[in-house]
Amino acid sequence: LFSPVDRAISKGVLPLINKSGKSIYISMFYLTNYWITDALIDARNRGVDIKIISDVTLTKEPKAQIFKLREAGIPVKIENWNGKMHQKSAVFDEEYTIIASTNWTGASEYANDENMLIIKNKDIAAKQTKEFFRLWKSIPDKFLYEIPNFTSKKLE
């Protein structure tokens, strides 16, 4: 899919969130889209296991959805290694993988020239899930609750 022409978020991401029944693992540099936030909260309320990794760079921006997601009980870890976590990827129900240039923002939906691959393949989903959990485990658990300061190296 390509944005803004194809509306990659509303036609690609939202349907996958809405039909997920088991798990959603997201690595996203910046997430401000309210539709996605609401859909993720609905999915959590359906019992879907959701985990999100985001970067510290824009966490405190007014449109950032990190706090709303955390308040809804969705675990969000914040990576703080000076903008290092720049992925835009997600795995849904161990079957679908999104790899994209697209942050999940209004600008990515309506303004920016973006691309998004949605791959239905369990092997690729397994590899991306493994990478997600490698990153997840590398981030201290305290950053599920705190917003870290910038640093140039991994904190122990």
Language-model features and meaning:
Residues L1-P4:
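Active-site cores of enzymes that catalyze phosphoryl transfer or operate on phosphate-rich substrates
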Residues D6, S10, S23, W35-E156:
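PLD/PLD-like phosphodiesterase catalytic module centered on the HKD motif
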